[in-house]
Amino acid sequence: MANEGLVIRGISVTEELYDLLLFLTHSFVRPTTTELYSIKHIDVTVGENPKRLILTIRKGKTGYRTSNTMPAAVSVYERICERYSNFQAEDYIFLPNYQNRTTASKIIQRQFNELLNRESLELDPQTGKKHMLYSLRHTAICMRIINSEGKVNIFNLAKNAGTSVDQIERFYAKYLPLSAEMARNLQSFGE
């Protein structure tokens, strides 16, 4: 969409949409004005060993927290820093030219909806529910559980995502596919 010069309601679609979608799927943050759209450069620290971003979420749904990302979020942040090379510590990392964060959020939501429409992905084929940016938070949490083959510490994942183990069980884990690793985990007697 960015390569074709698409304009939605007077705003050009740029590579920033791609980076924001990747960031969401590798950071566990909520796509809200108090989480994703409120992150400033001062709230981001690049960590090593393991490679990650350490995000300070100041006014998230569950209050203040620090959160680790997956390694892929680091390269996204590096591209953001290159794109806005003259950034200041107090600048927002996404759509920094829009001080009104509700406006920034709506711009991305419109672009994301157009992407879903173009790819005929408006609805989840299994649940029948409408896809939205928030779906990418679900994807991030579920990918972590699946890719760890069930070995991720669910309490740690919940704390990092600013949610609870109960919420993960009720809204995320119930949609996960069964796997051989899950069966081995269920049948194990410890090591």
What are these regions (language model features)?
Residues 22, 26, 31-33, 135-163, ...:
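C-terminal catalytic core of tyrosine-transesterase DNA break-rejoin enzymes
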Residues 1-32:
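Basic, Lys/Arg- and aromatic-enriched nucleic-acid-binding interface segment
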Residues 42-50, 150-171:
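Short, polar N-cap/turn motifs at the start of nucleic acid-interacting alpha helices
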Residues 59-79, 89-115, 132:
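C-terminal catalytic core of Y-nucleophile DNA break-rejoin enzymes
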Residues 1-6, 37-79:
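Conserved tyrosine-mediated DNA breakage-rejoining catalytic core shared by Y-recombinases
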Residues 57-63, 100, 159-186:
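Catalytic-site neighborhood detector that most strongly recognizes the C-terminal catalytic loop/helix
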Residues 14-19, 101-106, 124-147, 161:
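Short basic/aromatic active-site micro-motif
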